[in-house]
């Protein structure tokens, strides 16, 4: 560590702490306000528990960043916390889209109906053959034809990232204790480059699965304006990860000071600013106002909001529909939190177990196939040896004795 690098860090630390702390405070206050609004009007638990989980990403990021920025000793545990919650937030966003589509059963029905459209155009028999033979390529190029398989792949992609991200976070902590992690060091004898490669691939695959799922279902999600939600969330996950990776490269090649505290501090400072921007965006992207009203059939309260919609018919006629929504009474924040923790936790555990079983299944089949192949080769070799011995005995017995 050079004297110049140490001096640079000391000169910038206090101003960055003040500026970063200000942005982090704004981010936390705005996010908590938005979260409390959803908890106060918790009228659609299926959707709102995942919205709250996504919104909570901002205060988690902002809090751990300002703590890490104030004291570099807490950098690693804060980074582990951020990585774990990032993976969970990505899973929560995917679950939110599924909830907006009416739940898993309706999503599967919709995807199955979508997959039948190409069959009608191309011919059922030919398309079914292509679907069976090229499922992977269909997922990459034409996910519409996969039907139920698309939902399975999407869920597997999100959950595998959550599992790998959490596992690598604790592996990082273990390697750091052993002194072989080498944060920001791209050297083969450190664990850092290997973990970066694994997480990069895992994250890219998870995001790609989410993009493909969005491409197929975005027409059904128009009511919630999915593009703005998708961009705002993806920007946090994608930008912060590659931002940290880019800073590590710049420090490694000497473009920025190589001091570890400077590298981590710069990342934390930028995240504090970015979380304030994200918190403002979330107020408009994930508003609580749509949940302030519920269908009139679900509540006996009189205060209501009425909206009229004009529907044009093909023949030129006009139909006016009236929708009445009742203003929802406030819900208990304690009960809302309990539902998020208990019901959401059960949902996560179920999907994690299902994903692990899906991953173990092909491995078990592969191991069984290898064992069967080895066993068959051993039997074949034993059979050949027995045949050779029999031939030798036959030859010896068939030779006439010498006179």
From Swiss-Prot:
Membrane topology label: Multi-pass membrane protein
Family: Belongs to the TMEM184 family.
Protein's recorded name: Protein LAZ1 homolog 2
Pfam families: Solute_trans_a
Residue ranges of the TM segments: 16-36, 50-70, 162-182, 191-211, 236-256, 269-289
Cellular compartments per GO CC: membrane
Protein's cellular compartments: Membrane
Highest taxon above the source species: Eukaryota
SMART domains named in the record: Solute_trans_a
NAD recorded as keyword: no
Disulfide pairings: none
Location of the region described as Disordered in the Swiss-Prot/TrEMBL record: 381-403
PANTHER family, per database record: ORGANIC SOLUTE TRANSPORTER-RELATED
Keyword Membrane part of the UniProt annotation: yes
Keywords: Membrane, Transmembrane, Transmembrane helix
